Amino acid sequence: MHTEDNGLKKEIGLLFALTLVIGTIIGSGVFMKPGAVLAYSGDSKMALFAWLLGGILTLAGGLTIAEIGTQIPKTGGLYTYLEEVYGEFWGFLCGWVQIIIYGPAIIGALGLYFGSLMANLFGWGSGLSKVIGIIAVLFLCVINIIGTKYGGFVQTLTTIGKLIPIACIIVFGLWKGDQHIFTAVNESISDMNFGAAILATLFAYDGWILLAALGGEMKNPEKLLPRAMTGGLLIVTAIYIFINFALLHILSANEIVTLGENATSTAATMLFGSIGGKLISVGIIVSIFGCLNGKVLSFPRVSFAMAERKQLPFAEKLSHVHPSFRTPWIAISFQIALALIMMLISNPDKLSEISIFMIYIFYVMAFFAVFILRKRAKGEKRAYSVPLYPFMPILAIAGSFFVLGSTLITDTMSCGLSILIGLAGLPVYYGMKKRKAS
């Protein structure tokens, strides 16, 4: 097993890790996606099956990464795993895409979305939405610099906060609803494509792997990582299935498809009156804020880990740990600075979508890594073994290939741009390698 002492405080326990998994996955998708998944599925049975299948594929990936993470319990997650298994080149490319485009783009997109929702809720006008988003990102930057435990407190609080409206809809929807759950969607409003339905659920489940980036700050990663990954993904899968059951008990399948992104707020209004719509709006805002905090907490650990290995310019600065807070404060500031630039001059949401193709290539490589590590350490005792081996890793690989294939067919240009983003890091990689050699 590979361990490290990077000077960061080991403050992450099971509750923090669980809320990080749940909080970084559940954003707006649980409120916005049911209509789209139902439209693609054609009927409620297939829609519920799509949510279940998406959860199973994600769980397979999570359990596979948990085995790798217990063998390489280091800060950096996916980047670190690829470097340890495939070498410095592939690790660098993975880290490059995450820190230059993917991470800051997701932080920026969530910040802008949060600002827009806050402005709409309080009637402040769209002109203030970007300012609110920037303030939120800066606030979370400061919180996570002054202590990982404070970021963890925000994560726990927002996870509980987002689960309250979800729980209300599930409980009261199943209790008070009077619709037949298993119904079909009219062909005139359906767009039958079960593959697209699964793809929509997989994107709604995305974000779970960010827990792995904090391996070096866990109190006992060998036990904690698999427990948090398994528990968190099972909870999220159950939430997604139950809220769809509840919606189908309140609204007909046709109504959910027709209402689209407004289906959940309409269902809440039917259950709780005019306050119901506000409840959902607040739930989405808290959800986005918690998701944003999880990204601010975890993405900078990749640039910190790369800087520790002298793979980035200004590595000495980026790998600096604050003497009092014991957090990678310069790495956090660097990632937030990139996110703020994207918020000001571009469309971060589109940038994150463009880079997703390369990220899934790295997912496939990480899932294959479990076979390589087992071969290297044949006969050695493992702290954790993925259950149903080799079925689970193969299932995870199949799910990732499905995402890659679907994305390649539906958005070929974005896939090409994604590859170019990865290749753009090559001059930096060879430049830093030459500098280290000299």
From Swiss-Prot:
One GO location term (cellular component): plasma membrane
Q: Which organism is it from?
A: Bacillus subtilis (strain 168)
Q: What is this protein called?
A: Serine/threonine exchanger SteT
**Listed GO MF terms:** L-amino acid transmembrane transporter activity
The record's subcellular location field reads: Cell membrane
Q: Which residues cross the membrane?
A: 12-32, 46-66, 99-119, 127-147, 152-172, 194-214, 231-251, 270-290, 328-348, 353-373, 389-409, 412-432
**Effect seen on changing C168S:** Retains 25% of the transport activity
Cross-referenced InterPro entries, in alphabetical order?
A: AA/rel_permease1, AminoAcid_Transporter
- Among the Pfam families in the record, one is AA_permease_2
Assembly description? Monomer.
User: Where does the protein principally reside?
Assistant: membrane
Bilayer topology term: Multi-pass membrane protein
Per the UniProt topology annotation, the Cytoplasmic ranges are 1-11, 67-98, 148-151, 215-230, 291-327, 374-388, 433-438
